[in-house]
């Protein structure tokens, strides 16, 4: 794969609906492959983005009922933005893929979600929370920012590693 020193950046706006998840997956999969990620890392990106977008639809937009959605300031400028949307931006740098998911729903900071107690008996575990745990485990970095009037941005970063290493390839995986 030949890459210039300039990062490649591509954005696409999707309706914030569960039936958009397949299209979002195709979009990020193509960018992950162009970024040179190995098959396991591509799969990790697919799972993390699917879970993150599901969380945006469910929590930021109140499922597809869209309860409590903030008006989008650019709705007149962009007809596609009138309905709740998820803007997916993929930025390919020399050694990583950066995915930003931007929405105008209620803020939902993944940092406020504690890791689940995986050792606890199933009857003692809280419902939910595993998706956020998977996102954290599958990606190399996860950041969240909410700016009033501008929306929420979830940034997911996956670094390129040799294809023979596992999804979470660090010194312990070698």
Named regions from a protein language model:
Residues 1-11, 56-174:
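Conserved beta-strand-loop-beta-strand hairpin that lines the nucleotide-binding pocket
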Residues 5-39:
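Helix-loop-beta hinge of the Bergerat
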Residues 18-21, 42, 46, 83, ...:
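Short, structured helix-loop boundary elements
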Residues 26-50, 123-126:
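Conserved short strand/loop->alpha-helix "switch" segment adjacent to the catalytic nucleotide/phosphoryl-transfer site
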Residues 48-58:
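Short, well-structured hydrophobic secondary-structure segments
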């Amino acid at each position: 794969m030949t890459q210039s020193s300039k990062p490649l950046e591509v954005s696409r706006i999707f309706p914030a609906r569960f039936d958009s998840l397949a299209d979002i997956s195709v979009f990020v999969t193509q960018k992950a492959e162009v970024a040179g990620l190995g098959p396991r890392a591509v799969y990790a990106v697919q799972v993390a983005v699917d879970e993150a977008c599901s969380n945006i639809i469910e929590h930021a937009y109140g499922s597809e009922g869209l309860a409590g959605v903030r008006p989008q300031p650019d709705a007149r400028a962009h007809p596609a933005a009138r309905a709740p949307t998820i803007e997916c931006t993929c930025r390919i740098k020399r050694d990583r893929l950066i995915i930003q998911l931007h929405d105008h729903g209620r803020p939902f900071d993944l940092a406020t979600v504690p890791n689940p107690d995986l050792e606890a008996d199933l009857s003692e575990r809280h419902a939910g929370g595993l998706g956020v745990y998977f996102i954290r485990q599958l990606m190399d970095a996860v950041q969240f920012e909410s700016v009033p009037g501008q929306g929420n941005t979830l940034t997911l970063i996956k670094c390129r590693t040799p294809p023979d290493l596992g999804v979470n390839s660090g010194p312990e995986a070698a």
